[in-house]
Structure formats: structure tokens, C-alpha cells
Design a protein with these regions (language model features):
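Extreme N-terminal, non-catalytic leader segments
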Residues: 1-6
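Hydrophobic anchor at the beta1->P-loop junction of P-loop NTPases
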Residues: 9
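P-loop (Walker A) phosphate-binding loop of NTP-binding proteins
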Residues: 12
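Conserved lysine of the Walker
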Residues: 17
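Hydrophobic positions on the alpha1 helix immediately C-terminal to the Walker A/P-loop
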Residues: 20
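N-terminal phosphate/diphosphate-binding loop that engages ATP/GTP or pyrophosphate donors
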Residues: 26-91
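Small-molecule kinase domains that catalyze NTP-dependent phosphoryl transfer to phosphate-bearing small molecules
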Residues: 71, 116-123, 132-135, 139, ...
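ATP-dependent NMP and nucleoside kinases share a basic, alpha-helical "lid"
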Residues: 87-164
Length: 225
């Protein structure tokens, strides 16, 4: 039987998880899975249905009619919500807040769990999120908890949003990020925290290449791949 590797990268919003995980997946020829996009897609469905993200009953009622698919175009993950590519629509601050709210609903996490795990059964994967090493893939071959200061993380997110043409100030992004940090850490269902055996990597003040270099060194040391 062929050995399949699973690498879990967790951390708060804006820590660079997706960018770093995507780069490492490309280098290693692994599949990259962005689980945060799944929560954002469910949050988007709730927003479109005019259901509050923290309305557990209302959001849960939407789940039976939600169909999510992942496709890969030139190595980039795209997420489809009931057949519609919503990869761009889910990258707003509103979608981020909704994602944090719906991710605190146990029924939503249960709804997504097997879908998330299914990708690691037959593939080498790098999966990022907030509870990959603690809940989704507790048996992952390597668990990394990636973090940075809230100011660093907000600056990265702000620049990303400016590149997408979004009209938002740094102060607005920082405030939204600090609210999300509080929500993610305080929720009862799978709160944001490092797995006991996770390697902690702080990228405060690092360039993207420096951060990728640190993660690459950890993977090489631990897995020799």
C-alpha cells in the first residue's frame, strides 16, 4: 500500500496559512485543501438567504440543500456552491465574519468533517484551517501552528484586499481580525488552538519567502520529503 502524507497547518486569520500551504503543496506535488473556503461558502449561502451567521437553527436548516465541490484550475483551488464558482465572492470581510460565526455551529462542522477528511484518504495533502491538527486530521504526519502578530496579519489581509479592488481601510481590517480571533478562540466547538504535538511557527516580521523557508525546513526535518 502506498503511503500518503497529510500535513495540517492551523492558525488564526491572516497568518499566511493559505499562501504558504499553497506554495508548499506546489513544491511537494501535494494537493492543497483550503478548509476555510468551505466555511466561507456556507456563510455566503446563509448571507444570501438572509440568515444570520450565528443563527444555529437557521443555518442548520440550510445544510441539506448545500452541495459543495472543489475543483482545481492550474493548481488553484476553486470552490463551487451548488454548482456556482464562488471563489471570489467568499473573500470579503463580511464573508470572513460569517465564516467565523457558522464555524461555531456544531452541525456545520459535522456536515463538513467527512468531506474534508475524504481528500486525505487517497492523496498526499496539505490542509489548512483552524482545527485540522486537533479535529479533522488528528493523525496527520505533521502538524504546524502558524501565527503572527495581529498587526502583521491585518496588514497582509489589507494588502490582499486592496489588490482585489476592495475599498477597506487597514483599521477596519485590523478590527475585524481581532473580532474574529476572539470568536475563533472562544467558541465551544473546536476552538482555535494548537495541537499538543504541533510545531509552532511565528512569522511576525517575515517576508513570504522567509516564512515559506521556515515551513519548508520543518517539513524536511520531520518528514524528509
Amino acid at each position: 500500500m502506498t503511503k500518503h502524507y497529510a500535513i495540517a497547518i492551523d492558525g488564526p486569520s491572516g497568518a499566511g496559512k493559505s499562501t504558504i500551504a499553497r506554495a508548499m503543496a506546489s513544491r511537494l506535488a501535494f494537493i492543497y485543501i483550503d478548509t476555510g473556503a468551505m466555511y466561507r461558502a456556507i456563510g455566503l449561502r446563509a448571507a444570501r438567504a438572509h440568515v444570520a451567521g450565528d443563527d444555529a437553527t437557521g443555518v442548520t436548516a440550510l445544510l441539506p440543500d448545500i452541495r459543495l465541490e472543489l475543483t482545481f484550475v492550474n493548481g488553484e483551488q476553486h470552490i463551487l456552491l451548488n454548482g456556482e464558482d464562488v471563489s471570489r465572492d467568499i473573500r470579503t470581510e463580511e464573508a470572513s465574519i460569517y465564516a467565523s460565526q457558522v464555524s461555531a455551529i456544531p452541525a456545520v462542522r459535522s456536515f463538513l468533517l467527512d468531506f474534508q477528511r475524504s481528500f486525505s484518504r487517497e492523496n498526499n495533502v496539505i490542509m489548512d484551517g483552524r482545527d485540522i491538527g486537533t479535529v479533522v486530521l488528528p493523525g496527520a504526519d505533521l502538524k504546524i501552528f502558524l501565527t503572527a502578530s495581529s498587526e502583521d496579519r491585518a496588514r497582509r489581509r489589507w494588502l490582499e484586499q486592496k489588490e482585489r479592488g476592495m475599498d477597506v481601510t487597514f483599521e477596519e481590517v485590523l478590527a475585524a481580525m481581532e473580532r474574529r480571533d476572539a470568536q475563533d478562540s472562544a467558541r465551544a466547538a473546536a476552538p482555535l488552538k494548537p495541537a499538543p504535538d504541533a510545531v509552532l511557527v511565528d512569522t511576525t516580521g517575515c517576508t513570504l519567502e522567509e516564512a515559506i523557508g521556515r515551513i519548508s525546513a520543518v517539513i524536511q526535518e520531520k518528514l524528509h520529503v
